[in-house]
Amino acid sequence: MQTLKVELGERSYPIHIGEGLLDQPELLAPHIVGRQVAIVSNTTVAPLYLERLTQTLAGYNVLPIVLPDGEAFKNWETLQTIFDGLLTARHDRRTTVIALGGGVIGDMAGFAAACYQRGVNFIQIPTTLLSQVDSSVGGKTGINHPLGKNMVGAFYQPSVVLIDTTSLNTLPERELSAGLAEVIKYGLICDEPFLTWLEEHVDALRGLDQAALTVAIERSCAAKALVVGADERESGVRATLNLGHTFGHAIETHMGYGVWLHGEAVAAGTVMALEMSSRLGWISTQERDRGIRLFQRAGLPVVPPQEMTEDNFLEHMAIDKKVIDGRLRLVLLRQIGEAVITDDYPQEVLQATLVADYRALVDQLRG
């Protein structure tokens, strides 16, 4: 087992990474404040791991709250289901809410914990690669609004993140690839040697090689923990973790939540960010193509939806948390391993990026 730490003063917390951690109550007990525990999961993950976690928590009063699965249910109505469960079972301020699932479950359970009786204890047990390397670390919680993704939420840190890498053995191939999008992101924004390592090990990762997965998760979490420790509330450097997300969130919102997985939209959105960085002269076309090829090898889409127009993108991108005083800030690459957030770009370069022929670009790479 490896343990990392997110350094946030009195609110610092560990990230435990290893095999079989779901069966180790000693990793959870120090972070549970009372006898009441609510496990929030979904209809896909609960049949696989809920009973196992409940056995690990023997001696606690465990309340299972099982939600429907999917991004389409990351909304007020589903959030209300969590509150209904907690109130019906008379859970008090000493309850602990545990998120057992992927990013949607983590975001909603965390937001519920932040709101319930003005804040109760919260633990993250992510079961998808995307949630293990990204959404479970850093305290971002929330739900979607019909007009924009993650527009309603709170920063609320967990007391511990428990990553059992064997949970990935039950992850569908499409979900695994979606998680790799966020892993590749770290190499692009802050760790060029890691990007090289990913190019050498992407096939092993897709083959669920435990050693390779552990390295990828550790390096991703270490990168995110460092950034979160320096900028918890995303006022500066933390925003660079959103490479590709402004374009990607526009795709998710326009296509309908859940039609494109988050990681799939991030991959296509990152290709657009690479293209814009190239058009600005910050990275070479060879560096752009390096990123595109790796996303392809990871089994991810690299072409945005053909039906989305420039106006579609601009409409959704105008409702983005990085918009300040009406000016859209974008995360772009100065070079591989160095990301910046900026609103200092010619509007015509953004427009050219939005209307670029990405299918022709990808076909050219095949040739």
UniProtKB/Swiss-Prot annotation:
It is found in: Cytoplasm. Pathway: Metabolic intermediate biosynthesis; chorismate biosynthesis; chorismate from D-erythrose 4-phosphate and phosphoenolpyruvate: step 2/7. InterPro entries: Dehydroquinate_synthase (IPR050071), DHQ_synth_AroB (IPR016037), DHQ_synth_fam (IPR030963), DHQS/DOIS_N (IPR030960), DHQS_C (IPR056179). Pfam families: DHQ_synthase, DHQS_C. The keyword Amino-acid biosynthesis applies. Keywords: Amino-acid biosynthesis, Aromatic amino acid biosynthesis, Cobalt, Cytoplasm, Lyase, Metal-binding, NAD, Nucleotide-binding, Zinc. One of its GO terms (biological process) is aromatic amino acid family biosynthetic process. It catalyses: 7-phospho-2-dehydro-3-deoxy-D-arabino-heptonate = 3-dehydroquinate + phosphate. The keyword Amino-acid biosynthesis applies. Its cofactor is NAD(+); Co(2+); Zn(2+). Its main location: cytoplasm. HAMAP family: DHQ_synthase. PANTHER family: 3-DEHYDROQUINATE SYNTHASE, 3-DEHYDROQUINATE SYNTHASE, CHLOROPLASTIC. Catalyzes the conversion of 3-deoxy-D-arabino-heptulosonate 7-phosphate (DAHP) to dehydroquinate (DHQ). This is 3-dehydroquinate synthase. It comes from Pseudomonas syringae pv. tomato (strain ATCC BAA-871 / DC3000).
